[in-house]
């Protein structure tokens, strides 16, 4: 028996019978009470702080077309099960059905959905479902256009993590703005660990799809 254990035992014996534990009431607020409008505004502000461009819309095809025209892009790579009704006419979209890394690297970028997003930190979470694509699709290209539905938007990090309850065996990627890093001399470089440019479409109409 260690000296610490013996000392604590002697203290407990000296105190006599231990009183029953008293439960602590947890009536304090554990998360911000945001309205949906406040949540969207906070998420948008955080993304813009990260130099991401945000589009709020009820029409995904129109927002995608607007983003591609603004970036002067002719088309993007998309995950295998990306909803076809979201794709605007007049652009070239290539489904990733096993594209080589070289093809992905030389593409104009990727268009994906997401699993969840966190308003407080401006973070997008990917679990790489068939609507989001494999990790290479959102790490190799220089441009990422991501769609976030309002019903996927959580207030805080714990709430966002709870949205991953069914994704315990999936690889998880968290995105807080375009990729950037700094060395010991604080020289900031973009695009080292992922896309240099991030655009986000916030879909204000809730659309539920089924996993293939």
How does the language model describe each region?
Residues 1-212:
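The feature marks the mature, well-folded catalytic cores of soluble enzymes
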């Amino acid at each position: 028996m260690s000296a610490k254990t013996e000392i604590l035992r002697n203290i407990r014996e000296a105190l006599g019978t231990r009183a029953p534990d008293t439960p602590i009431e947890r009536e304090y607020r554990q998360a911000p009470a945001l309205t949906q409008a406040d949540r969207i505004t906070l998420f948008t502000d955080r993304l813009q702080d990260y130099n991401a461009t945000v589009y709020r819309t009820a029409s995904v095809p129109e927002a995608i077309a607007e983003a591609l025209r603004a970036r002067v892009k002719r088309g993007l790579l998309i995950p295998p099960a990306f909803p076809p009704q979201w794709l605007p006419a007049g652009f070239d979209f290539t489904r990733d059905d096993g594209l080589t890394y070289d093809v992905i690297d030389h593409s104009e970028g990727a268009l994906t959905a997401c699993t969840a997003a966190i308003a407080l930190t401006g973070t997008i979470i990917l679990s790489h479902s068939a609507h989001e694509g494999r990790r290479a699709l959102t790490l190799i290209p220089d441009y990422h256009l991501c769609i976030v539905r309002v019903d996927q938007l959580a207030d805080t990090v714990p709430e966002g993590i709870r949205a991953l309850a069914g994704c315990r065996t999936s690889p998880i990627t968290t995105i807080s703005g375009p990729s950037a890093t700094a060395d010991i001399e604080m020289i900031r470089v973009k695009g080292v660990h992922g896309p240099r440019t991030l655009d986000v479409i916030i879909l204000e109409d809730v659309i539920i799809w089924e996993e293939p």
